[in-house]
A protein has these predicted regions:
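Conserved donor-binding/catalytic core segment of Leloir-type glycosyltransferases
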Residues: 180, 200-216, 222-226, 234
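Nucleotide-activated donor-binding/catalytic signature segment of Leloir-type glycosyltransferases, i.e.
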Residues: 201, 228-237, 242-269
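Nucleotide-sugar-dependent
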Residues: 216, 257, 261-273, 278-299, ...
């Protein structure tokens, strides 16, 4: 947009933090907002009541991707060709949505992969049905092969995808790591308003901030909290594993673990500054399917990172540098 290009974004209505459509955004299947540089179309994401119902989530992804595809045909007005289409995964279903848009509106298709599915779901045990996995793997390969460019976050992810494709597709794979706005996330004083809101004094805080899923191995945080009762451990975020972690904390009467909801993006710098040490855990074997990009935000905030991730992969290599 800064170069004068016209952009049309088709995305979801705000829902991720609460796993429900945020107040003031409900009541419509989509909303269109005109901007100085183009337009934003926000589509209903069809969220279920819980992230643990995988069949319901899959249905939501399919419905969302279908509506996104239809709205992408008219974003910016008809009949208009476009120069490029950018689709992002997850959800994986947006790969074919991008291809569908390209068929009708021309332009190159760039498929940006944040996590590799269905590998991530299969390796965490979230999906075990062989028929579902077979269908998802077909969708994955079909999406890669129909893209002009596939962008991945690390060499580890690139090698994973390359192993699934014929060599004639390998020149389409490119690595572009995630990044942060270092002017928005800056080092700050550790004694923040956020710390006071949590009811934590000047104790050392070990923090995990991000998605609280089953791939993060956050049981490590609870184990550390048991052995270091003088340190406060903060889990900031939400996800499918949060309830089970809270149940474990309550059952074991661990009183130095604090759970907090996602905070507004404007508070990210303050939240990260509240932590003295940040942990970035990932289950063994998952570094080839996912890159915890929260590391970049933590480093921008000037805080140390303790990573529990497969040795020799993207995050350990970056920290070693």
């Amino acid at each position: 947009a800064a170069l004068g290009h016209e952009l049309h974004v088709v995305t979801s209505l705000p829902w991720y933090r609460e796993h429900a459509i945020e107040s003031g955004w409900g009541g419509r299947l989509w909303r269109v907002e005109k901007t100085a540089w183009g337009s934003i179309t926000r589509v209903h994401p069809f969220p279920g009541k819980t992230k643990r119902n995988l069949l319901r989530r899959a249905l939501g992804f399919v419905l969302f991707s279908a509506v996104v595809g239809l709205r992408s045909l008219v974003a910016g007005g008809l009949p208009r060709r476009v120069d490029g289409v950018l689709a992002m995964s997850p959800p994986l279903t947006l790969g074919l949505t991008g291809w569908f848009t390209k068929l009708f509106r021309s332009g190159m298709l760039v498929f940006n992969i944040q996590d590799i599915f269905p590998d991530a779901a299969a390796q965490t045990g979230a999906i075990t049905n062989k028929q579902i996995l077979r269908a998802a793997r077909w969708l994955e390969r079909a999406s890669y092969e129909r893209s002009d460019t596939v962008v991945l976050l690390s060499e580890d992810l690139k090698q994973n995808v390359a192993a699934k494709l014929s060599t004639k597709f390998h020149d389409r794979l490119h690595v572009i790591p995630n990044f942060v706005d270092t002017s928005a996330i800056v080092p700050g004083d550790r004694m923040t308003s956020y710390r006071r809101e949590l009811g934590i004094d000047d104790r050392v805080i070990v923090m995990y901030a991000g998605n609280v899923g089953f791939s993060q191995s956050l049981e490590l945080v609870l184990a550390a909290a048991r052995s270091m009762p003088h340190i406060a451990f903060v889990i900031n975020g939400d996800g499918a594993a949060r309830k089970s972690l809270q149940d474990e904390v309550n059952a074991a009467d661990i009183d130095n673990v604090y759970f907090a909801d996602y905070q507004p993006i404007e508070r990210l710098s303050e939240v990260l500054s509240s932590g003295d040490i940040h942990v970035v855990p990932l289950k063994t074997g998952l570094a080839s399917v996912s890159v915890p990009s929260k590391m970049y935000s933590i480093l921008s905030a000037g805080r140390p990172v303790v990573a529990a991730i497969d040795a020799g992969t993207e995050i350990p290599r970056t920290l070693a540098e």
